[in-house]
């Protein structure tokens, strides 16, 4: 049972909003005030916040790597057309990305496969960790897809993104065929990072969805600096020291989140154990 529990959650408790747990887009998740209230009413041996970067962000990657992503959805002809509409810098293209920021305390939850995450703990750092996808045996099936530790990788942040018609350079209309959609960035700026590690980011403390391009992790201070303060709390996570503290926290959160219209939800190891018991 504990193997199942560990696969379902990486912490004793994870708290956020229903939107987060139900994969709904939102402008706001759990608030600092709500986190403070929970922290004041529970006894944590480890705690911290995961943040969503709420600003358009991209990581530059090789065209071959991005082609691997889109080859799952597009024909060869569609793929060639798609790649031709992307901005290129040599053999590099601008790929979508999901950047999550973490409090320093939560770096303990990452499994480091290569490299070292300690540079991310230093003040005013430019270190980034790339989150990788492992197979069922814990192996990295496609290492060539990812940048290497020590590589410099460029992130582009933008204030806004709109789609234009690549034939005219004007904003797209409802009559513009999809093959002519092209992104146009406003207020774009580049930041160069050094890849310090390849890590496994537990799904239960991530965005909980994937996509094309890289998933990446920054320290919250670095993310706030480079995104212009666009990192907002997405989840609050904590562990407890013993069964007594765990039971008390479970009781508190159960009451806090009771009711159909509660602004908060939570997952815990206790709820995962309950789910496992129902499966048996």
Where in the sequence are the language-model features?
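Basic-flanked hydrophobic alpha-helices used for secretion and membrane insertion
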Residues: 2-277
């Amino acid at each position: 049972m504990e193997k199942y529990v560990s696969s379902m959650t990486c912490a004793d408790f994870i708290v956020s909003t229903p939107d987060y747990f139900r994969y709904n887009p939102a402008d706001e998740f759990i608030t600092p005030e709500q986190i403070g209230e929970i922290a004041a009413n529970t006894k944590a041996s480890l705690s911290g916040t995961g943040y969503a970067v709420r600003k358009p962000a991209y990581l530059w990657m090789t065209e071959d790597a991005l082609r691997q992503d889109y080859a799952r959805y597009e024909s060869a002809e569609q793929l060639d057309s798609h790649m031709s509409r992307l901005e290129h810098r040599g053999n590099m293209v601008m790929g979508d990305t999901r950047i999550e920021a973490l409090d320093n305390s939560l770096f303990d939850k990452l499994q480091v496969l290569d490299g070292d995450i300690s540079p991310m703990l230093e003040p005013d750092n430019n270190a980034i960790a790339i989150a990788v996808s492992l197979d069922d045996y814990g192996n990295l099936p496609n290492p060539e897809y990812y940048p290497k530790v020590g590589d410099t990788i460029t992130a582009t942040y933008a204030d806004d993104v709109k789609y234009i018609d690549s034939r005219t350079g004007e904003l797209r209309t409802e009559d513009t065929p999809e093959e002519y959609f092209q992104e146009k960035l406003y207020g774009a700026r580049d930041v160069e990072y050094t890849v310090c590690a390849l890590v496994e980011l537990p799904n239960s403390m991530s965005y909980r969805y994937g996509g094309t391009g890289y998933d990446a992790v920054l320290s919250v201070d670095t993310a706030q600096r480079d995104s212009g303060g666009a990192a907002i709390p997405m989840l609050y996570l904590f562990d407890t020291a013993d069964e007594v503290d765990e039971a008390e926290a479970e009781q508190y959160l159960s009451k806090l989140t009771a009711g159909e219209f509660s602004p908060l939800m939570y997952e815990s190891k206790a709820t995962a154990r309950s789910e496992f018991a129902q499966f048996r």
